[in-house]
Swiss-Prot record:
This is Cytidine deaminase. It comes from Aeromonas hydrophila subsp. hydrophila (strain ATCC 7966 / DSM 30187 / BCRC 13018 / CCUG 14551 / JCM 1027 / KCTC 2358 / NCIMB 9240 / NCTC 8049). Homodimer. The lineage of its organism: Bacteria, Pseudomonadati, Pseudomonadota, Gammaproteobacteria, Aeromonadales. Pfam families: dCMP_cyt_deam_1 (PF00383), dCMP_cyt_deam_2 (PF08211). Binds 1 zinc ion. InterPro entries: APOBEC/CMP_deaminase_Zn-bd, CMP_dCMP_dom, Cyd/dCyd_deaminase_Zn-bd, Cyt/Deoxycyt_deaminase, Cyt_deam_dimer, Cytidine_deaminase-like, Cytidine_deaminase_bacteria.
Length: 293
């Protein structure tokens, strides 16, 4: 078990703690299957919403917030029935625009886990405007519920007179299946192959700047991030930030990155290269490897 979970575990009820412990091994990927959820519910007698609220301290324990010291956790419910942790992440010494919000982290975890939508997101603080706009891009934005410790409401109630993809004549949505197979690369390098697969599933209907980052760590594990664009532009989530957030949820230390690659479309209107290099520079001395295809 990752040591970050030790303290929040001690705050949980004895039945919940006992049921959780076998699930929080070194291979825990910050998600729970429907069978695991059923086990936790049976052990505690809690319903879905109450159980997610009880688990929030564990999600918040994944937070990396050296600037704000404000630790936020989120849990996204995938349409498959899986639950996905998310936590906010900040980069010490870097502009605040590099930050990843907890809701973005949980949604990214679900998207990278193969989900095509989420039905509900549980968070320990009211979503900020940035996150409300980010969630309004989702395939399930019209039906998405936001669960807070003292409230359960539709996302749309947080966004009266909302602006979204349809206002820019876009019929696609974040988390809808993507297949940008026009992106090709001849390489037998597993890291570049991972980046290519992720880039083909990225979402960039406004700039066509399909892109992904793949990070390899000292233990050999690879974590990817896809570009997630937004109708309001600024809430778009860059692939480097998503990859870092995904790795942290997986228990990695970003100081142990050994290789980092960025693959993006050469035909896009934008490039992630400068942003990715700046983020990576804040984490250590690894040089970004780059290809536009």
């Amino acid at each position: 078990m990752h040591p970050r979970f030790a303290k929040p575990l001690d705050t949980l009820s004895a039945p919940l703690k006992a049921a959780l412990l076998p699930m929080l091994g070194d291979d825990f990927q910050a998600r729970f299957t429907p069978d695991q959820v059923a086990t936790l519910k049976a052990a505690t007698g809690l319903d879905d919403r109450a159980l997610r609220l009880a688990l929030l301290p564990l999600a918040a324990a994944c937070s990396v917030a050296p600037i704000s010291k404000f630790f936020v956790g989120a849990i996204a419910c995938g349409l498959s029935g899986n639950w996905y942790f998310g936590a906010n992440m900040e980069f010490a010494g870097q502009g605040l625009f590099h930050s990843v919000h907890a809701e973005q982290s949980a949604i990214s975890n679900a998207w990278l886990g193969g989900e095509t939508g989420i039905s509900e997101i549980t968070v320990n603080y009211t979503p900020c405007g940035h996150c409300r706009q980010f969630m309004n891009e989702l395939s399930t934005a019209k039906i998405l519920k936001v669960s807070l410790p003292d409230d359960l409401s539709a996302l749309q109630s947080f966004l009266p007179h909302s602006f979204g993809p349809a206002d820019l004549d876009i019929t696609d949505a974040l988390m809808s299946p993507q297949a940008h197979d026009e992106l090709t690369l001849v390489s037998d390098d597993p890291l570049w192959q991972a980046a290519l697969a992720a880039a083909r599933q990225s979402y960039a209907p406004y700039s066509q700047g399909y892109a992904a980052v793949a990070l390899q760590f000292a233990d050999g594990r690879i974590f990817c991030g896809r570009y997630a664009e937004n109708a309001a532009f600024n809430p778009s989530l860059p692939p480097m930030q998503m990859a870092c957030a995904h790795a942290v949820l997986g228990g990695e230390d970003l100081a142990t990155i050994r290789r980092a690659v960025l693959l993006e479309s050469k035909d896009g209107q934008i490039s992630q290269q400068d942003s990715a290099r700046a983020t990576l520079k804040a984490l250590g001395s690894v040089e970004l490897e780059y290809q536009a295809v």
